[in-house]
Amino acid sequence: MGLTSRPTPASRQPASPPPADPVLLPEPKRLGVLSRLAPEPMKVVLNWGRRYSLWVFNFGLACCAIEFIAASMARHDFIRLGVIPFAPGPRQADLMIVSGTVTDKMAPAVKRLYEQMPEPKYVISFGACSNCGGPYWDSYSVTKGVDQIIPVDVYVPGCPPRPEALLQGILKLQEKIARESLAERYATGATGGGPSTDALRSGLVAAPTAPGPTAPASTAPGPTAPAPTQDEERR
């Protein structure tokens, strides 16, 4: 009886776990068209400075403005979050907080003050009246939300909201600032295009008009009108 070599069983190797998906961190693009020229540490520093140095312009219109004052005092103290209250005016402010009922008569003033703020600028709608009209939504003289006049970044609900709600809204705004790109937010993008989507939605920037095809000038003389006859001249 001949000896034959028995096949050796394949060595059992533990199944390798599937490769984990790489964690993709958001690239800090916050310098618009200059983002490709600035070093990465500089982008982080500039973004950090924008998040934690928000000068606030409070546009108080009703009782929600009292809650804003309470949030800025020592008990809640939103200065510890990097928010500086009571800017001298809209030209020195980064953040406008609209608190209270916006009437149709006040709407042009809200829009004008928003236009005076320098870029980058942000808006928090504070309270039900500013969000959608609140208890006075069915009034003939009340604007149904300040977002019909200017773009809003964060909505804080409540009638009136507590100061803690405003602190939460400020944190949400800082999170939004951390992941946004100035090239996408403002008028000119990195591709050199026209106004951004936010700028067009705000109604403050006119949409660019595409140049249409122009008709070629004709060099051939057109048909001339016949000379009037003597009968037509008498008439």
From Swiss-Prot:
Q: Which domain of life is it from?
A: Bacteria
Broadest EC class assigned to this enzyme: translocase
Membrane topology summary:
Peripheral membrane protein
Name the reaction it catalyses. Answer: a quinone + NADH + 5 H(+)(in) = a quinol + NAD(+) + 4 H(+)(out)
Q: Where is the composition biased (Low complexity)?
A: 1-14
Concerning InterPro entries, the annotation shows: NADH_UbQ_OxRdtase-like_20kDa, NADH_UQ_OxRdtase_20Kd_su
- Describe cofactor binding as the record notes it: Binds 1 [4Fe-4S] cluster.
| Location in or out of the cell | Cell membrane
User: What GO molecular function annotation could you give as one example from this UniProt entry?
Assistant: quinone binding
Q: Where is this region: Disordered?
A: 1-24, 188-235
Which UniProt keyword terms apply here? 4Fe-4S, Cell membrane, Iron, Iron-sulfur, Membrane, Metal-binding, NAD, Quinone, Translocase, Transport
One GO CC term, this protein = respiratory chain complex I
Q: Which GO terms describe its biological process?
A: aerobic respiration; electron transport coupled proton transport
The record's section on Pfam families has: Oxidored_q6
Which metal ions or organic cofactors does this protein require, according to UniProt?
Answer: [4Fe-4S] cluster
Might you give the EC number(s) for this enzyme?
Answer: 7.1.1.-
Primary residence: membrane
What's this protein's function? NDH-1 shuttles electrons from NADH, via FMN and iron-sulfur (Fe-S) centers, to quinones in the respiratory chain. The immediate electron acceptor for the enzyme in this species is believed to be a menaquinone. Couples the redox reaction to proton translocation (for every two electrons transferred, four hydrogen ions are translocated across the cytoplasmic membrane), and thus conserves the redox energy in a proton gradient.
**Can you tell me which family this protein belongs to?**
Belongs to the complex I 20 kDa subunit family.
Q: Subunit composition?
A: NDH-1 is composed of 14 different subunits. Subunits NuoB, C, D, E, F, and G constitute the peripheral sector of the complex.
PANTHER family in the record = NADH DEHYDROGENASE (PTHR11995), NADH-QUINONE OXIDOREDUCTASE SUBUNIT B 2 (PTHR11995:SF33)
What protein does this entry describe?
NADH-quinone oxidoreductase subunit B 2
* Originating species: Streptomyces griseus subsp. griseus (strain JCM 4626 / CBS 651.72 / NBRC 13350 / KCC S-0626 / ISP 5235)
Gene name of the record: nuoB2
